[in-house]
């Protein structure tokens, strides 16, 4: 039986196995405190998250179950990899994932990225999205803080706490608003994987510009910023609005023509980058480019390899999503998922394979942003 250590970190009681040492708080993730820790078995740093009050209610328990199921199922080089799950004697749940040096938000806060980074990063984001979407999963919360990067420029999408098959109600996180697709703001009853493509387009624009494209102060201001650049929503979008108040708001907007996107990025921006941006930032999601088609775009030709852009083995099983179960039942189901994971060897994501044939200089980011990658090794 595993031995456990107890510690208090930022006022939160941590109860973890002796496998992990040198815990340091690194932030709050979705519904949990996250610490870096050194894994004495793999000799690697991990991100160790304590799931806050997973059994306080059925909705929280269901969310925890969903996140664990997704982390177990989704296995791809550009997605964060599950390393360990365990339940403490106090019946708290801990999830360990691989730890990368920094996130895209921190890099963008220092200085604009060179064009080579923007190109390579958006390729990896779209490569990950192709896999996620093939599993019939929508991330729903794609933003720079959820894009993790290491010193070799390997990129991984993280935080699947909000991922869904579909979700009629939009979430209200201010930090997410900048990257939120128009169809969510227009309160469509159903939306699809295209919302992630919009978010990725906003991220590409931010990497090219060095600042957010649509930094809305609220939902109304956000939509004004979008129409200022992309013009008024077309008839095909208006026909899908079901809320009378939303329709009234959209119809009250002044008439605006779409701007040339070359005017919102630096003058030396690659033409192909602007063209891809145009295909991603389309108000009507039905004609927005897919991740698979975006990977074929000329802008990403230096990295595109159809034989090395895998899809999921099959769609993720969402049969639990509409279940309305008591928290005790969710608890039993969560324990079952944890035991199932522990009954087999924890899969290792391995090293990224993109560098083998890629023309990218994989040490370039370390030279540019070395301050973010100082403490990469375990305890001496």
UniProtKB/Swiss-Prot annotation:
Entry remark concerning the domains of this protein: The TXY motif contains the threonine and tyrosine residues whose phosphorylation activates the MAP kinases.
Domain (Protein kinase): residue spans on this chain: 20-300
Motif interval(s): TXY: 171-173
Upper lineage: Eukaryota, Fungi, Dikarya, Ascomycota, Pezizomycotina
Residues noted as binding ATP in the record, renumbered to the chain: 26-34, 49
Cofactor(s) needed: Mg(2+)
Source species: Aspergillus clavatus (strain ATCC 1007 / CBS 513.65 / DSM 816 / NCTC 3887 / NRRL 1 / QM 1276 / 107)
Protein name: Mitogen-activated protein kinase mpkC
PROSITE patterns in UniProt: MAPK (PS01351), PROTEIN_KINASE_ATP (PS00107), PROTEIN_KINASE_DOM (PS50011), PROTEIN_KINASE_ST (PS00108)
Keyword annotations from UniProtKB, A to Z: ATP-binding, Kinase, Nucleotide-binding, Phosphoprotein, Serine/threonine-protein kinase, Transferase
Enzyme Commission designation: 2.7.11.24
Catalytic machinery residues: 141 (proton acceptor)
Keyword Transferase: yes
Catalytic activity line of the entry: L-seryl-[protein] + ATP = O-phospho-L-seryl-[protein] + ADP + H(+); L-threonyl-[protein] + ATP = O-phospho-L-threonyl-[protein] + ADP + H(+)
């Amino acid at each position: 039986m595993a031995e456990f250590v107890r510690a208090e970190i930022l006022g939160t009681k941590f109860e973890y196995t002796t496998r992990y040492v040198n815990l340091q708080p690194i932030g709050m993730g979705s519904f949990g405190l996250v610490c870096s820790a050194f894994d004495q078995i793999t000799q690697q740093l991990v991100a160790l998250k304590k799931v806050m009050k997973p059994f306080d209610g059925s909705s929280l328990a269901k969310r925890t179950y969903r996140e664990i199921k997704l982390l177990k199922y989704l296995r791809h080089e550009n997605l964060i990899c599950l390393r360990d799950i365990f339940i403490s004697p106090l019946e708290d749940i801990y999830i360990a994932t691989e730890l990368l040096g920094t996130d895209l938000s921190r890099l963008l806060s220092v200085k604009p990225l060179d064009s080579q980074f923007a190109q390579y990063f958006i390729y990896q984001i779209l490569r990950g999205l192709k896999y996620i979407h093939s599993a019939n999963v929508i991330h729903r919360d794609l933003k720079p803080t959820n894009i993790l990067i290491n010193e070799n420029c390997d990129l991984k999408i993280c935080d699947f706490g909000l991922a869904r098959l579909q979700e009629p109600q939009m979430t209200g996180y201010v930090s997410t608003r900048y990257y939120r697709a128009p169809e969510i703001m227009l309160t469509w009853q159903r939306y699809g994987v295209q919302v992630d493509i919009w978010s990725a387009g906003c991220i590409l624009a931010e990497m090219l510009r060095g600042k957010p494209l649509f930094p809305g102060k609220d939902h109304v201001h956000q939509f004004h910023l979008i129409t200022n650049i992309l013009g008024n929503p077309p008839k095909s979008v208006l026909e899908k609005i079901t809320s009378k108040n939303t329709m009234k708001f959209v119809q009250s907007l002044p008439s605006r023509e779409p701007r040339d996107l070359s005017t919102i990025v630096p003058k030396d921006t690659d033409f192909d980058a602007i063209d891809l941006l145009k295909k991603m930032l389309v108000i009507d999601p039905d004609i927005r480019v897919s991740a698979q088609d975006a990977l074929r775009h000329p802008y990403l030709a230096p990295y595109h390899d159809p034989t090395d852009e895998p899809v999921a083995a099959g769609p993720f099983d969402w049969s639990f999503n509409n279940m309305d179960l008591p928290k005790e039942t969710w608890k039993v189901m969560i324990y079952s998922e944890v035991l199932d994971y522990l009954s087999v060897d924890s899969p290792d994501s391995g090293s990224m394979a993109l560098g083998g044939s890629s023309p990218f200089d994989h040490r370039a980011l370390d030279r540019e942003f070395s301050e973010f990658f100082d403490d990469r090794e375990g305890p001496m």
